[in-house]
Amino acid sequence: MRNSQTSPDHYKRFEIEPFDFIHANGLGFAEGNVIKYVCRWREKDGIEDLEKAVRYLELLIVYAKIEKEKNET
């Protein structure tokens, strides 16, 4: 059952809530946070949410580069 804690107003405008999309597609923590913050920035914390999304994208890039280097050696 969804309530204001599990289904906040800033996600109700979407056909599928970010959590459901993230879960259905098996996305990881950082990827999920990018989606969460990008989806809610207009309705919740504005630029702060976009900055958080960027931070998680930067982390994904760092870890992707580490994985690439591991696979190349």
Regions inferred by a protein language model and the residue ranges of each:
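Intrinsically disordered, low-complexity regulatory regions
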Residues: 1-73
